Amino acid sequence: MNADAKTEIKGRERYKAGVLKYAQMGYWNGDYEPKDTDLIALFRITPQDGVDPIEAAAAVAGESSTATWTVVWTDRLTACDQYRAKAYRVDPVPGTPGQYFCYVAYDLILFEEGSIANLTASIIGNVFSFKPLKAARLEDMRLPVAYVKTFRGPPTGIVVERERLDKFGKPLLGATTKPKLGLSGKNYGRVVYEGLKGGLDFMKDDENINSQPFMHWRDRYLYCMEAVNHASAVTGEVKGHYLNITAGTMEEMYRRAEFAKELGSVIVMVDLIVGWTAIQSISEWCRQNDMILHMHRAGHGTYTRQKNHGISFRVIAKWLRLAGVDHLHAGTAVGKLEGDPPTVQGYYNVCREMKNEVDLPRGLFFEQDWADLKKVMPVASGGIHAGQMHQLLDLFGDDVVLQFGGGTIGHPMGIQAGATANRVALEAMVLARNEGRDIAHEGPEILRAAAKWCKPLEAALDIWGNISFNYTPTDTSDFVPSVTAA
């Protein structure tokens, strides 16, 4: 692209009928200094052969704001200089020829207050299908404080949840009921009771258990809450079960949520696939009814896993904090699901910090002030077991729910023993950490010492102690070498 093609055309020539380059229409400005009130998006773009990266960046800015493929005179009926998004920086992606990071600034006036649906319609609504790009990925966003303040965020937050549970200074423990499909309501409730009695704080529904022929949702709720109440009475601890209210319509979701509330549940769950409007709607219901909202990120891997195209999960986490969820599955790094340890830590930081600093090794490109929005409790779930407790505590600290589904239900001595093994492993590791021991390196030794007086933990370590999922992550930082969790 020649120099003129990168320069904005001014005056009458700008609005003559015809086709101009996006940069010529004003969607590229290398001298632009973003305002504090601008929303900034960072895209990873792979232009088609022969497409200049600056023109590709300008096209992203144009197609995600006000542009179309040709000049339209009706631009002059608007404050078009203000409304145009502006690509202002393009950097080659380190070590990846043909890919570029492009920074695009959007004036805040382009977005409806408090609406993730509107935000996503602009930022990801059109550009990902644009022919001049082989691929595009939304890597990160900076959300201005003025925009953050239009959202209400999590209905409960970490602090209030811990106060309700009376649990402080250590991770919470949970498990997903297995098998996730096929159990009758009564047997399902039995699994819930055994897990809670054995020492877990929560049990949960999985993403695809809704209301199938083998178990109506109402039956599941009744048996699960019976299990919760019985386990609470027996142990003297506050217990809970994440009742999945995901359904085909909002009306049905509200109906299930109301029934869960009537039964005394303190928490309900929805899947990410219900959509942004449904998430914000049920979040508002939870706020009005003093309920914790658990978010299962079902389906996210279809657009977050590939490094060259889609949306980074750190962006999804930011949107979900705005939308208002209390719990969010955010990866384990050491389990069976995709997750580079530093990258996953970046997701956790998005959930738990009041201000994110720039942290390129963890994938955070911008400072992000959360304007006192409540914190989200990250959830580590998927292929984890008691033998990894030292890794999990070292990676994620205290404010996390550690969910051992198969690592509880699959215990050779039974479900209650599986829960007890996880509880003892956690308590032993927290104690060792608080005594100043190096749990990252001494973890296996600490666990074996605890197992000498806990047969369930000994059995768990014997059967799963050497199980790991050390595959090369696909979504890693571009600024540091990838590491493994081992």
Swiss-Prot record:
Its EC number is 4.1.1.39. The keyword Transcription does not apply. Belongs to the RuBisCO large chain family. Type I subfamily. It catalyses: 2 (2R)-3-phosphoglycerate + 2 H(+) = D-ribulose 1,5-bisphosphate + CO2 + H2O; D-ribulose 1,5-bisphosphate + O2 = 2-phosphoglycolate + (2R)-3-phosphoglycerate + 2 H(+). Mg(2+) binds at K204, D206, E207. Its cofactor is Mg(2+). One of its GO terms (biological process) is reductive pentose-phosphate cycle. This is Ribulose bisphosphate carboxylase large chain. RuBisCO catalyzes two reactions: the carboxylation of D-ribulose 1,5-bisphosphate, the primary event in carbon dioxide fixation, as well as the oxidative fragmentation of the pentose substrate. Both reactions occur simultaneously and in competition at the same active site. Keywords: Calvin cycle, Carbon dioxide fixation, Lyase, Magnesium, Metal-binding, Monooxygenase, Oxidoreductase, Plasmid. GO terms for molecular function: magnesium ion binding; monooxygenase activity; ribulose-bisphosphate carboxylase activity. Binds 1 Mg(2+) ion per subunit. PANTHER family: RIBULOSE BISPHOSPHATE CARBOXYLASE, RIBULOSE BISPHOSPHATE CARBOXYLASE LARGE CHAIN. It holds the Pfam family RuBisCO_large_N. It comes from the Bacteria. The keyword Flavoprotein does not apply. InterPro entries: RuBisCO, RuBisCo_large_chain_AS, RuBisCO_lsu_C, RuBisCO_lsu_C_sf, RuBisCO_lsu_fd_N, RuBisCO_lsu_N_sf, RuBisCO_lsuI. The record marks K336 as: Transition state stabilizer. CDD domains: RuBisCO_large_I (cd08212). The active site is at K178, H296. The modification N6-carboxylysine is found at K204. The basic functional RuBisCO is composed of a large chain homodimer in a 'head-to-tail' conformation. In form I RuBisCO this homodimer is arranged in a barrel-like tetramer with the small subunits forming a tetrameric 'cap' on each end of the 'barrel'. Heterohexadecamer of 8 large chains and 8 small chains. Transmembrane segments: none annotated.
